[in-house]
Structures are given as C-alpha cells and as structure tokens.
Curated annotation (Swiss-Prot):
Protein name, as recorded: Methylenetetrahydrofolate--tRNA-(uracil-5-)-methyltransferase TrmFO
Biological process according to GO: tRNA methylation; tRNA wobble uridine modification
Swiss-Prot/TrEMBL catalytic activity: uridine(54) in tRNA + (6R)-5,10-methylene-5,6,7,8-tetrahydrofolate + NADH + H(+) = 5-methyluridine(54) in tRNA + (6S)-5,6,7,8-tetrahydrofolate + NAD(+); uridine(54) in tRNA + (6R)-5,10-methylene-5,6,7,8-tetrahydrofolate + NADPH + H(+) = 5-methyluridine(54) in tRNA + (6S)-5,6,7,8-tetrahydrofolate + NADP(+)
Source organism of this protein record: Lactobacillus acidophilus (strain ATCC 700396 / NCK56 / N2 / NCFM)
Superkingdom of this protein's organism: Bacteria
Family as reported in the entry's similarity comment: Belongs to the MnmG family. TrmFO subfamily.
Enzyme type, top EC level: transferase
Cell compartment(s), UniProt: Cytoplasm
Amino acids binding FAD: G9, A10, G11, L12, A13, G14
Amino acid sequence: MPENVTVIGAGLAGSEATWQLAKRGIHVDLYEMRPKKETPAHETGEFAELVCTNSMRSNQLSNAVGLLKEEMRHLDSLIMKAADMTQVPAGGALAVDRDSFSKYVTDTLKGMDNVTVHEEEIVKIPEDGITIIATGPLTSDALAKQIQAFSGTDSLHFFDAAAPIIAADSIDMDIVYKKSRYDRGEAAYLNCPMSKEQYEKFANELIKAETAQLHGFENSDVFEGCMPIEVMAARGAKTMLFGPLKPVGLEDPHTGETPYAVVQLRQDNAAASMYNIVGFQTHLKFGEQKRVFSMIPGLENARFVRYGKMHRNTYMASPNVLTASYEAKNRPGLFFAGQMTGVEGYVESAGSGLVAGINAAREALGKETVAFPKNTALGSMANYVTTTSAKHFQPMNASFALLPALEGKKIRKKRERHEKISERGLASLDAFKTEVLD
C-alpha cells in the first residue's frame, strides 16, 4: 500500500499537487490554516483563492504561459480544469470568476475520498514522511523561520500588489466603450478614454497621492510584472502610456480616433457585476484610490467593491535547495512548490505543484522521481529555479527565453517561431507522459 503524503497549503500549488496525488490513488493529508488563521491578503477560507488579478494571462500558444497552460491540460490539471470551467470574457487571455474558480477547486478536493482536509496551521517542517510544502509567499512566520533555517539562507522577498475592483453599475457607459485591442476576439474589455490633458492631470495626482505604510517596502523591491501603478508613474511622464494605459488598437467609436491614453476594465465575475482596473496594482491609501482613480473618465462615480493593496512575498534561494523534481537536495521525500520556490504567477505556481505532486506520488509508489524535459514549459521552469546562480536568483514567469532554441533554419517571425517552440514542447511532453509517467 502506498505511503500517505502530507501537503501543507491549499493555494494553487498545494491544490494542484493534492489533485495529482489523489488521482493516482495516494491518500493525502491536506493542511490549510485558513480560515482559522488569516493572511494579510486572503479574504476567504477557500482553496486556490486568487488574491491579485483574476487573469491567468494569455491562452495563445504563441505565448509561453499559453504553452504552460496547454501542457497542464495534457496532464489533467485541476487548476486548468477549474479555470476553463469558470472563465469570463477576456479576449485572448484566460480570466476567471474568482469565487466560482476557488469553489470548484475546494469542492473537488473536499469531495475526494482519499483527501483528508485539516484546518490547522503547521509551524514545523515534518521530520519524516513524504511532504509537499506549498504555503505560498504569505507563509506564516513560524513556518517561514523553519524554512529559512532549512534552506540555510536568509529569506528573499519582493512586494506584490492587487488592483481595485469596481461595481459595474457605477461605470458611466456613455463615456466608456467595449472593445478588445485590435478587435481581436470578442469585445471583452471596457475602455476609459483619456485626452492628453486628462492623462497629465491624472498622472500628476497619482504621483502626489499618499501611499499606505508597509514595513520594509522600497520601490526597488517590487516585481516588475506586478508593479504598483504609482511606482510606474513616478518612473517617467509617459511610462504608463507604454504599459497599462497604452492606447494603440483601441479606437474610440464615439470619435473614430485613438485616445491619448486608455484605462481598461476587465470583467471580474461571471455575472459581469464587477470589473477590475487592468494593471492598476496599488498601495495607495484607500481614500486616495477613491480620489485619484475617480479622475478616470467614466469612473467619476465609481463604487469600489475592493480597494487595491500590497503584501510582502517571500521565496527561497531554490538553486541551493531543490532538484528539478522540486525535491529537497538534502532531504529525500520533502518537496516544495509554488511561488516560494521562485516561480512567479498563478499558472507557474500551479505548474510547480503539478510537477511536485507527480513526483511525490512516484516516491510514494516506490518509483524514482523524474525531471520534466527542458524543452517543455514545465521542465524549463523547474530547470530555471534549480540551476540559476543563487546569488542573482529572482522570481521568473514562464518565458520562451528559458526554452532551448529551435534547431535548423531560424524562423524570422516571432509569433511563428514561438508557436513552433510550443508545438515541439507539447510533442515532447506527450512522449514523456507515454514513456515515463504512464
């Protein structure tokens, strides 16, 4: 009979790991401290709660995270199944109804006979047995100290932020218009057009706005992919125009012209009663968010369902600690998964949980752990977090830069080249699944 496995943390990585274990017949003891003990960012006790955006980014195979998603679908990922079941309109991206998404994951795992859920905090790394630690970037202090001592290095960190969510019925639809950039796919976003004068006034007030105090925060500590909008604005007068306020491909049907700047709103739930402000992660004080963001055309009377906020994310110096199976080098049977390993992003975190879960299951069944092929997105992420120089280690999203170049004549068109890399990755994964995993 296979050994039981303990999974600590029911976020994206822990939930995916639990699913991969349980569907292989392994009994899982899943520990989650919420809702009994809260974190600075979570609001519910549900599994796989999305604390920042509701977007899982591109769904296209010309994008590395699109490849990662498709690889996970090929391996029967619970997180991808939940995302596909609860998606909301978002053009070429995959966005979800965050409440329905978490409920799907929670109900699925709690409904499995070989998953026992324990609502309690774990404060020590278990000394024996097969364990996956997937407690995320908001790991409780007691366990974080244990992990720091185990890894033999100081915890590394960066700051992450969430964007505000506003009520749909408070948006002025006489000003705002529905459109996706370059009219790709369905018209999935609401767009708030700005003139040059409106943009400059907004940018000026944004830079002057008062931020919430957060211990240890420095502007240099932010993750580039989730930068607070006020930090971006302070980098230069036009910086936002090349980021979330980029107007290209978003002509205003009211005027037939491209606005100077455009703020986009993305549907946040299936009922379309809430929208988040795309790219507006922030740590402004709540009153300042209301004052400054209400300067956006169409949001003058916006009702804020949730204000944006920032939290500290910690991660390990994984190259010193982990193998490509996410198993600890000096402690067989102990695995780590999720953002604490240095992968960055919802899908990347779930992907690491998938790899760790499959390998923990193999160990429980008396098989050898395996490294995924480096020409797959899953394998390239594992390779990055375990072989990069620990001295310069930083969190990383899925990227084609992590994958080996194609052999033969170079394909000049980037989209076509990336699609070929994805095609190669999926073929490699399917062969690996047949020859090694099945």
